[in-house]
Amino acid sequence: MQRADSEQPSKRPRCDDSPRTPSNTPSAEADWSPGLELHPDYKTWGPEQVCSFLRRGGFEEPVLLKNIRENEITGALLPCLDESRFENLGVSSLGERKKLLSYIQRLVQIHVDTMKVINDPIHGHIELHPLLVRIIDTPQFQRLRYIKQLGGGYYVFPGASHNRFEHSLGVGYLAGCLVHALGEKQPELQISERDVLCVQIAGLCHDLGHGPFSHMFDGRFIPLARPEVKWTHEQGSVMMFEHLINSNGIKPVMEQYGLIPEEDICFIKEQIVGPLESPVEDSLWPYKGRPENKSFLYEIVSNKRNGIDVDKWDYFARDCHHLGIQNNFDYKRFIKFARVCEVDNELRICARDKEVGNLYDMFHTRNSLHRRAYQHKVGNIIDTMITDAFLKADDYIEITGAGGKKYRISTAIDDMEAYTKLTDNIFLEILYSTDPKLKDAREILKQIEYRNLFKYVGETQPTGQIKIKREDYESLPKEVASAKPKVLLDVKLKAEDFIVDVINMDYGMQEKNPIDHVSFYCKTAPNRAIRITKNQVSQLLPEKFAEQLIRVYCKKVDRKSLYAARQYFVQWCADRNFTKPQDGDVIAPLITPQKKEWNDSTSVQNPTRLREASKSRVQLFKDDPM
């Protein structure tokens, strides 16, 4: 078969003085690269395709081809063949074996040359399959370059300038690492190259649905702008992936690389968001993309069972790198010891028993990142201010979608053509606008630029089993403003002067211990799954795995208003029987002594010194001209 010019491999300059191969030898003249009738990825070939490839190279010995079929030599095994294996397959001549080996090595080299290599600051040099590159080079994926990974956190941590784009590349890479490792350790799992490619695509595309400033958009803005809509960025990712596939002609490319679009697109979506349809009965396997014997594949990108997945591994490493925080979790070690075992008639990814402590450390790392960075008190208030600005601008921003239809910031999620155009750049569009209708939104963003932020008042927690319900969040500012501090104040504050931010901190599964949902195996019985309870690990592990933090901010920033806001806040904490703010005795020394539970006999504070501090505090504000 004669190749088209576009398919000719580029010739490299010779680096030695050896004579050229004579033109009548198969290794020089034969068409040894994949032809039009063969799949471009040799790893997808079965024995018949391997035989076809060898015949085209001039290797037509019946014994060789017969042994290839009988031994079921597939394309994936070609790089593993050496001279001794060829001899066993019936190639008796040493010269022929060398020619055959050279022929196959050229094929492998061509395949390697088609892989794109990028240099990632976290994972080093990453190889990307041509299909992944085709997906990356689309407007829908490139959009992720313009969405900050940590939203308003960049205004607090100057190194946190990374975006969803590079995180998505990292997750796609790690997904491939884990699924390849499982396949190599356990060939009986029959993980195909098609499975590998689908898992990598799911990792690559899992965050396509994020909006401006990442979690600020789906966690703060959408619930306020459209409270009737229960929308998540995972749902957005599935919709955007569908749009990416259809608008860029990706289905034929998927078929070219051995995928079956009808099944595999469904499988990729299910890995991102879970089952697309609820099963009729609980006992039924809820997924359509892969059968139950491939259930473990659904635990790689987004693990709904226990939260141990490659998404976390990448953002732990990447966020810590950019934040300047130490990452204590080693995902490479987890991959080394990961194994698939049968648990409750399902195949699940299990960890080695000795790794249980490291997994607790992983969830502790997650909690620590939330405390130190993701829920930083200044980062959160910047997210809140950006949300306020977007809400004020929502009615006046127009984004063109399919068919020329116009959408607002909050409704762009209904049309993926419009949503593709919605990124962090909307911040600058509002900030630099001259439209009088955007004046209020513009002023809020200017305050962020000038660092005139809403002021942090304090933090508290509910006591006992009490938790503030989500439906009560909206009424909390009014509660704070209704608290009547038993001190003389120069100003009176209203509900609209306060912002109350409720933060739910946990190990990823609300009150549950995620390790209770992890299966382990031991060295002596690697195919038998076991459970390990918390008490079997250490007596120093957490008793509770969730807590609620309540932070109060004041929109007024003058000193008298801030002093009043702190008195309102501490009084509210006392009225609601919340914990005493850590600096309560300093910011409200006349209020904290009135709460008996806050001043038990074990307190190390000196009452006399506390009274003196109170007098000093009152005197300070009394004489202050303000």
Swiss-Prot record:
Note describing how the cofactor binds: Binds 1 Mn(2+) ion per subunit.
Result of changing residue 319 to A: Abolishes dNTPase activity
Residue numbers bearing the Phosphoserine modification: 18, 33, 93
Outcome of swapping residue 77 to F: Increased stability of the tetramer and increased deoxynucleoside triphosphate (dNTPase) activity
Mutation effect (residue 376 to A): Impairs homotetramerization and abolishes dNTPase activity
Mutagenesis / variant outcome for changing residue 622 to A/E: Abolishes proteasomal degradation triggered by the viral accessory protein vpx
Residues annotated for dTTP 2 binding in this entry: 119, 156, 333, 352, 354, 376-377, 523
Impact when changing residue 369 to S: In AGS5; loss of function in defense response to virus; decreased oligomerization
Effect of residue 385 to V: In AGS5; loss of function in defense response to virus; loss of oligomerization
Effect of substituting residue 167 to A: Abolished ability to restrict infection by viruses
Known outcome of mutating residue 254 to V: In AGS5; loss of function in defense response to virus; does not affect oligomerization; decreased ability to restrict LINE-1 retrotransposon activity
Keywords of the record: Acetylation, Aicardi-Goutieres syndrome, Allosteric enzyme, Antiviral defense, Chromosome, Disease variant, DNA damage, DNA repair, DNA replication, GTP-binding, Host-virus interaction, Hydrolase, Immunity, Innate immunity, Isopeptide bond, Metal-binding, Nucleotide-binding, Nucleus, Phosphoprotein, Ubl conjugation, Zinc
Outcome (variant: residue 617 to A/E): Abolishes proteasomal degradation triggered by the viral accessory protein vpx
Keyword Hydrolase found: yes
Modification type (Microbial infection) Phosphothreonine: residues: 592
Phenotype for residue 143 to C: In AGS5; loss of oligomerization
Impact noted for substituting residue 290 to H: In AGS5; loss of oligomerization; decreased ability to restrict LINE-1 retrotransposon activity
Residues holding dTTP 1: 149, 164, 210, 215, 312, 315, 319, 375
MF GO annotations: deoxynucleoside triphosphate hydrolase activity; dGTP binding; dGTPase activity; GTP binding; identical protein binding; nucleic acid binding; RNA binding; RNA nuclease activity
Result for mutant: residue 226 to G: Loss of function in defense response to virus
UniProt disease link: Aicardi-Goutieres syndrome 5: A form of Aicardi-Goutieres syndrome, a genetically heterogeneous disease characterized by cerebral atrophy, leukoencephalopathy, intracranial calcifications, chronic cerebrospinal fluid (CSF) lymphocytosis, increased CSF alpha-interferon, and negative serologic investigations for common prenatal infection. Clinical features as thrombocytopenia, hepatosplenomegaly and elevated hepatic transaminases along with intermittent fever may erroneously suggest an infective process.
Protein name according to UniProt: Deoxynucleoside triphosphate triphosphohydrolase SAMHD1
Organism for this UniProt entry: Homo sapiens
Gene it is expressed from: SAMHD1
